[in-house]
């Protein structure tokens, strides 16, 4: 069983390398037309250059997974902001794509919790489609739209989970098929359990990104031993191994909050279930210390009898 690792957005080991610098719309409004254009251009250019720095860091450390920042283009989906963020940076998008393809990196996006398809308000669904389209356009500009995924949560329950799920199935029909083909769903820590998310994924033929921390915060009746094989099966129509999210609770009191690093004891039960299936899968670390937490966790795992480190960020068990 091969386990590959990655982290989210910011490389903590790199100085001054945020790929998510932004500008608020309030600040944007105060600028002249030319100043607005210059500001959007400068911030986006810096985010793209920082992303390239991070990719070089990942390549040097043999880190095969990486989640791109959704904020890579500031105000990209704001209805009052017009900005050709694709055409203006074609060489940089292509450079990012070349690095990803040459080194066979698995990159993804994870829009925020407001991108959802369970609302009964049409403008919420419209906004979700706009946001998904933005993420897809970026992947397309990079040249990896057919091999990378955009991960979201199911959404809210709005007092009636069954009705909300019905709306999801209806509203998702409005998302262009080529974008839906590149989306994944993740169980959340308060509303939609692993079993409920799995059922939706199976009906819509959407790959399931399993989050173990969320699962433990929002348990369902079905045991993980039964759920995980079916979760992995949702990836069978793709050419990519399943991906899971790993993080640890900040504390018993703040169980849903992410800790700085990974607590191996918290994760062990999941790993033992995964080992019984013995299926290769990828792990996205969602701890606050990001790449540093990932490398420390890999080091701890590699000290366990039977687990072999076969590269900087890949283990065999």
Curated annotation (Swiss-Prot):
Documented EC number(s): 3.-.-.-
Keywords, ordered alphabetically: DNA damage, DNA excision, DNA repair, Endonuclease, Hydrolase, Nuclease
Highest taxon listed in the record's lineage: Bacteria
Pfam families assigned: UvdE (PF03851)
Alphabetical GO biological process terms: nucleotide-excision repair; pyrimidine dimer repair; response to UV
Keyword match Secreted: no
GO molecular function, one term: endonuclease activity
Annotated SUPFAM superfamilies: Xylose isomerase-like
Family stated for the protein in its record: Belongs to the uve1/UvsE family.
Function noted in UniProt: Component in a DNA repair pathway. Removal of UV LIGHT damaged nucleotides. Recognizes pyrimidine dimers and cleave a phosphodiester bond immediately 5' to the lesion.
NCBIfam families recorded: uvde (TIGR00629)
Name assigned to this protein: UV DNA damage endonuclease
Gene symbol of the encoding locus: uvsE
């Amino acid at each position: 069983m091969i386990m590959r690792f990655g982290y989210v957005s910011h490389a903590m080991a790199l100085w001054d390398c945020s790929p998510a610098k932004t500008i608020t719309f309030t600040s944007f409004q105060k600028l002249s037309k030319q100043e607005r254009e210059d500001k959007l251009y400068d911030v986006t250019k810096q985010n793209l250059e920082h992303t390239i720095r991070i990719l070089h860091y990942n390549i040097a450390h043999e880190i095969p997974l990486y989640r791109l920042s959704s904020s890579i283009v500031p105000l990209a989906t704001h209805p009052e902001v017009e900005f050709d963020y694709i055409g203006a940076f074609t060489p940089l998008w292509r450079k990012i794509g070349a690095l990803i393809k040459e080194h066979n990196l698995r990159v993804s996006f994870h829009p925020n919790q407001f991108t959802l398809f369970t609302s009964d308000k049409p403008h919420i669904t419209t906004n979700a489609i706009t946001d998904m389209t933005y993420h897809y356009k970026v992947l397309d500009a990079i040249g990896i739209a057919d091999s990378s995924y955009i991960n979201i949560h199911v959404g809210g329950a709005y007092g009636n989970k069954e009705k909300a799920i019905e709306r999801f199935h209806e509203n998702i029909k409005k998302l262009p098929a080529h974008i839906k083909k590149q989306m994944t769903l993740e169980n959340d820590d308060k509303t939609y359990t692993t079993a409920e998310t799995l059922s939706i994924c199976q009906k819509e033929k959407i790959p399931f990104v399993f989050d173990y921390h969320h699962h433990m915060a929002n348990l369902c009746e079905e045991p993980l031993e039964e759920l995980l094989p079916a979760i992995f099966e949702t990836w069978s129509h793709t050419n990519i191994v399943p991906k899971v999210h790993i993080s640890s609770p900040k504390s018993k009191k703040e169980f849903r909050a992410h800790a700085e690093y990974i607590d191996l004891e918290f994760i062990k039960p999941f790993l033992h279930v995964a080992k019984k299936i013995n299926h290769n899968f990828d792990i996205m670390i969602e701890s606050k210390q990001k790449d540093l937490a990932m490398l420390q966790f890999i080091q701890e795992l590699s000290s366990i009898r039977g687990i072999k480190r076969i590269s900087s960020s890949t283990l065999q068990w």
